[in-house]
């Protein structure tokens, strides 16, 4: 489906047109329907919208779609486009009028392109008439160009509309399947309910088992057995009703099943119709590549004709030479005879193709109308079946469950009676506790009594079906009487104790009652035995509440103190920069001067101590200083005179300084411009380094992907090698087996033919040599001997037929095991074709099994099934015609070397595929080896590796500030984060900035770019010719010399103590 704007795409099912919009534009489902009405003029009640999986689009789905779209906008991501398919309910009636009404806004009538005005013009026309014709032809040309563009747009739109219409049919079929699935699910639920009842309530189960059980168990709370609570006649009637309901439901469900099967057949016909329509109406944009090419040539031709026309119209006949006028006339004739007919032909061709697309679309719409009508009929049938049968089935199932409960009461009665006894004991115990509690507490009796009544009502509702069996004595009046006087309760009920209940449970165990029922009674009795008449005190509750509140206050106080302590700790850590994470303001490198720098006061004391030493030493030379003072006074006088002279010169210099101020301003501007250019160059260099890092990572990722692909290919090659070897082995075994079988068959045929000829010869000799008497005497012996020979020949013939069929069946299994299927062609001629996935259904044990019996269901060939049927018939009839027919079928299979040629060709294809895979693997292996050879190493460098060399930052003299900080970087030997140091002031006026390469000192060291290798540095040995004029280079390491920084070792780069560094000799290989 083509790209549309927005996150919602609406598709018109009958026209195939689509519209893109945003779902958040609509507030409600009705707003979306109004948008559909405006676009496609479908009445609101007739709009029917489906989702891509066939479900009906409802308000809940619309709200979910809107909420997801809003969430996607809030998160700043683009939501995937949802597709909805819009149908017109009127089209499901199947009428042509509904189709015409639904497509009246979509129907288009194409107009055939008109002929050019130049077609009817004469060859020789006047100047004025020619100008008029050419001007008119320009208008015709513009109209034709518009028509051609429209025709081509119609063709492209038809391809997309066809795909949308076929997709709408598929979605509608899924909708019908979902609708039918709901009905089938109801049917299966009903059938399972009936089967469950049939399994739980088997015939005579309650008579054979439960009746004997009830007659055995004593009703300990009353006289007699439990059977006194059961009405046997009522149970018999319930059994008869159950059987009748089962028969009635089975009949109704079979009718319902028939309706579902009929509907399934209709759906299958609709699916086949949709599939057949999709096969007949197939089109693709690639089928119209010629039209697109013609459209491109058409544009060029139109452009050329317009230029030629303007050239002719712009000519001035009064000033044009005769030669130019002659060329204009020839150009006019050529245009009339060649260009204009060609343009008209292109327009007519596209008109014809567009009209054909319109006709095809109208035909497809009529086909869709029939399919929509069939879907409506199928849906109506489903609804009728549901309304007519399912409702009655539900009523009968409800009655079936009710009857089942009556029968199940018999089997549940022992357990319920046990619960009844336990409840009697609990009530007796409760009343005793209440009587005792009443003397002490009278205020809470009403609430306790109310809870007891609620519990009794719940128990009665849980076992309401047994209410007519057990008769409760109403003690509510006596409970009310309890509040009027202080006399204890006197309720006439049996006295039940725990021993009685335990005796009843033991009786159930002796009668083989289910173990889970006994466990239930024991558990319930255990709970009731622990029952205590306890009433909660409101005072205790209030105290508990107060203690809980105080504990909550203490917890909240501790939480506040913890929050304050965490805030103080955070402030302390924030003020201490040494605890900050590693970054720009806090380096993770070791500061060797930390806590070792003298304070300001210490420095002042040291300087004071040095000045005192100098004074003491100066006293020893006081005399010399006095003589020097006299000389200095003389020089001072001379200097004063010189100062006067300099003052005069200063006045003149000031005037010169005023003039030099302007020059200084200009110099500042120039210097600022140079600094800006220098900053740009530095930024460019940083960007280049980052690009190199990214390129190296990308290269490594691609290399890893290539390695994984090569490993996968190697695994595939090994798999195909083993598979080819297995197939070759199977081929050789089968060919050898087939050759042996054929040789044995031919030898047996030859022996049998020889025996037949010999027997015939002996028979003829005996017939000629005997006389009438001997004939009479031996007439009873010769037929017997001949009959024996004939029977032996039949037995031999039968074995030959079995051997021939076994060889044939083995050959068919061989073919299907290698993916070949024996079938019949259109002319009933045998052919062997390649079928993908055929080998998956073949059991490998067929090949290894030595048994002559082959499972015919595993063989997919229809020809094999036909031959097997002939062979089976031949075993029964042994007729001559059947034998000849059987042999002729086998001869058709082996004639013209069809079997041998197919097997050899199949194995040849497998061998060619293996060779192709080996060739591809060899090529990819060479690519990987080349990549491994050319990859750049960034850590654990060795001799022979390729490495990226970059210059380090800073001047060689500034060891402590620039070089040391650069070389101490934990990321690599090159500092990629700090800017370059400022240049000396004295040389600023001599800087010359080139437009491509920044200034670099010759003594700047070069280092290898490494990643994540701490404590090791690699520096390039001095080689001015190798790095001259380069910002970086890729080199191959020739040799490496290891150094470790200690007190006496070599340390030209002022590295910290303990640092390991290598001096590398490399040769430049290439530049990336």
Swiss-Prot record:
Example of a GO cellular component annotation carried by this entry: Atg1/ULK1 kinase complex
PANTHER family given in the database record: RB1-INDUCIBLE COILED-COIL, RB1-INDUCIBLE COILED-COIL PROTEIN 1
Coiled-coil parts of chain: 615-804
Protein name: Autophagy-related protein 11
Family membership noted in the UniProt record: Belongs to the ATG11 family.
Protein transport as UniProt keyword: yes
Location (main, coarse): membrane
Pfam families: ATG11, ATG17_like
Lineage start: Eukaryota, Fungi, Dikarya, Ascomycota, Saccharomycotina
Lineage: superkingdom: Eukaryota
Keywords annotated in UniProt: Autophagy, Coiled coil, Membrane, Protein transport, Transport, Vacuole
GO biological process, one term: positive regulation of autophagosome assembly
A GO MF label: protein kinase binding
UniProt-annotated location(s): Preautophagosomal structure membrane; Vacuole membrane
Subunit structure: Homodimer.
Organism of origin: Eremothecium gossypii (strain ATCC 10895 / CBS 109.51 / FGSC 9923 / NRRL Y-1056)
Known function: Involved in cytoplasm to vacuole transport (Cvt), pexophagy, mitophagy and nucleophagy. Recruits mitochondria for their selective degradation via autophagy (mitophagy) during starvation. Works as scaffold proteins that recruit ATG proteins to the pre-autophagosome (PAS), the site of vesicle/autophagosome formation. Required for the Cvt vesicles completion.
Membrane topology term: Peripheral membrane protein
């Amino acid at each position: 489906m083509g790209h549309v704007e927005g996150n919602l795409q609406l598709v018109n099912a009958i026209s195939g047109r689509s519209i893109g919009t945003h779902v958040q534009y609509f507030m409600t489902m009705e707003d979306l329907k109004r948008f559909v009405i405006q676009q496609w003029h479908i009445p609101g009640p007739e709009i029917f919208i489906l989702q891509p999986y066939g479900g009906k689009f409802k308000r809940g789905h619309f709200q979910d779609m809107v909420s997801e779209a809003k969430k996607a906008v809030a998160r700043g991501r683009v939501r995937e486009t949802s597709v909805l398919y819009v149908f017109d309910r009127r089209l499901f009636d199947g009428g042509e009028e509904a189709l015409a009404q639904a497509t009246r806004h979509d129907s288009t009538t194409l107009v055939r392109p008109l002929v050019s005005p130049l077609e009817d013009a004469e060859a020789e026309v006047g100047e004025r008439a020619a100008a008029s014709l050419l001007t008119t032809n320009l208008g015709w040309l513009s109209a034709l160009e518009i028509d051609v563009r429209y025709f081509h747009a119609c063709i492209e739109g038809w391809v997309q509309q066809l795909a949308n219409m076929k997709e709408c049919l598929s979605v509608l079929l899924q909708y019908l399947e979902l609708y039918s699935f709901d009905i089938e699910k109801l049917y299966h639920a009903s059938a399972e309910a009936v089967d469950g009842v049939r399994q739980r309530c088997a015939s005579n189960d309650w008579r054979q088992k439960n009746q004997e059980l009830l007659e055995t168990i004593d009703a300990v709370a009353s006289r007699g057995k439990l059977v006194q609570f059961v009405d046997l006649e009522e149970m018999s009637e319930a059994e008869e009703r159950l059987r009748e309901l089962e028969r009635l439901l089975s009949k109704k469900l079979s009718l319902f099943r028939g309706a579902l099967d009929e509907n399934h057949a209709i759906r299958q016909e609709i699916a086949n119709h949709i599939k057949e329509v999709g096969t007949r109406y197939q089109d693709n944009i690639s089928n119209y590549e010629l039209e697109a090419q013609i459209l491109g040539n058409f544009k060029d031709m139109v452009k050329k004709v317009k230029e030629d026309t303007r050239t002719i119209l712009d000519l001035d006949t009064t000033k044009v030479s005769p030669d130019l006028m002659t060329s204009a006339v020839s150009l006019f004739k050529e245009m009339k005879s060649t260009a204009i007919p060609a343009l008209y032909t292109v327009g007519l061709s596209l008109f014809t193709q567009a009209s054909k697309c319109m006709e095809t679309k109208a035909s497809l719409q009529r086909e869709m109308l029939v399919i929509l009508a069939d879907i409506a009929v199928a849906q109506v049938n489903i609804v009728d079946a549901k309304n007519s049968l399912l409702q009655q089935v539900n009523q009968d199932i409800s009655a079936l469950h009710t009857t089942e409960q009556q029968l199940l009461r018999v089997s549940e009665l022992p357990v319920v009676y046990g619960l009844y006894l336990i409840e009697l004991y609990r009530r007796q115990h409760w009343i005793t506790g209440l009587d005792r509690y009443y003397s002490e507490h009278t205020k809470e009796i009403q609430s306790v009594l109310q809870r007891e009544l609620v519990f009794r009502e719940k128990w009665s509702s849980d076992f309401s079906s047994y209410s007519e069996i057990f008769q409760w004595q109403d003690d509510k009046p006596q409970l009310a009487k309890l509040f009027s006087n202080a006399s204890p309760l006197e309720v006439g009920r049996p006295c039940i104790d725990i021993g009685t209940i335990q005796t009843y449970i033991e009786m159930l165990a002796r009668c083989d009652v289910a173990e889970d029922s006994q466990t239930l009674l024991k558990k319930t009795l255990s709970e009731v035995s622990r029952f205590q008449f306890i009433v909660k005190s409101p005072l205790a509750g209030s105290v508990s509440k107060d203690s809980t509140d105080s504990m909550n206050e203490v917890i909240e106080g501790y939480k506040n103190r913890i929050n304050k302590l965490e805030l103080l700790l955070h402030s302390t850590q924030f003020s201490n920069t040494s605890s900050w994470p590693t970054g720009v303001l806090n380096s993770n490198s070791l500061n060797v001067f930390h806590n070792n720098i003298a304070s300001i006061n210490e420095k002042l004391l040291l300087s004071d101590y040095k000045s005192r030493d100098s004074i003491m030493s100066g006293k020893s030379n006081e005399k010399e200083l006095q003589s020097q003072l006299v000389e200095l006074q003389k020089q001072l006088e001379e200097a004063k005179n010189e100062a006067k002279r300099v003052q005069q010169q200063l006045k003149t210099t000031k005037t010169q300084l005023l003039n030099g101020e302007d020059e200084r301003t200009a110099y500042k501007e120039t210097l600022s411009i140079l600094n800006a250019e220098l900053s740009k160059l530095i930024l460019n260099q940083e960007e280049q380094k980052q690009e190199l890092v990214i390129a190296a990572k990308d290269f490594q990722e691609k290399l890893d992907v290539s390695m994984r692909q090569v490993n996968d290919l190697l695994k595939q090659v090994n798999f195909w090698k083993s598979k080819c070897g297995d197939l070759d082995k199977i081929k050789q075994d089968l060919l050898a087996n087939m050759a042996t079988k054929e040789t044995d068959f031919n030898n047996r045929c030859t022996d049998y033919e020889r025996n037949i000829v010999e027997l015939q010869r002996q028979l003829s000799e005996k017939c000629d040599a005997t006389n009438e008497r001997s004939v009479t005497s031996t007439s009873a012996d010769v037929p017997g001997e001949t009959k024996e020979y004939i029977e032996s020949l039949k037995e031999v013939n039968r074995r030959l037929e079995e051997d021939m069929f076994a060889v044939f069946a083995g050959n068919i299994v061989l073919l299907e095991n290698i993916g070949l299927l024996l079938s019949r062609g259109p002319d009933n001629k045998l052919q062997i074709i390649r079928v993908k996935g055929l080998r998956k259904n073949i059991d490998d044990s067929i090949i290894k099994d030595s048994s002559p019996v082959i499972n015919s269901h595993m063989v997919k060939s229809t020809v094999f099934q036909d031959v097997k049927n002939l062979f089976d018939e031949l075993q029964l009839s042994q007729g001559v015609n059947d034998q000849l027919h059987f042999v002729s079928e086998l001869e058709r299979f082996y004639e013209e070397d069809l079997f041998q040629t197919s097997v050899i060709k199949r194995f040849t294809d497998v061998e060619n595929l293996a060779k192709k895979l080996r060739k591809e693997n060899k090529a990819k292996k060479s690519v990987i080896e080349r990549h491994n050879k050319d990859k750049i190493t960034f850590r654990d460098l060795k001799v022979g590796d390729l490495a990226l060399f970059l210059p380090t930052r800073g001047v060689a003299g500034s060891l402590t500030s620039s070089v040391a900080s650069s070389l101490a970087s934990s990321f690599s030997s090159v500092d990629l984060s700090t800017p370059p140091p400022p240049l000396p002031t004295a040389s600023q006026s001599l800087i010359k900035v080139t437009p491509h390469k920044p200034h670099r000192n010759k003594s700047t060291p070069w280092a290898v770019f490494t990643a994540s290798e701490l404590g090791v540095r690699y520096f390039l040995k001095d080689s001015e010719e190798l790095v001259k004029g380069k910002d970086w280079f890729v080199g191959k390491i020739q040799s490496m010399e290891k150094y470790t920084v200690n007190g006496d070792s070599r340390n030209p780069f002022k590295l910290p103590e303990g640092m390991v560094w290598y001096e590398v000799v490399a040769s430049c290989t290439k530049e990336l």
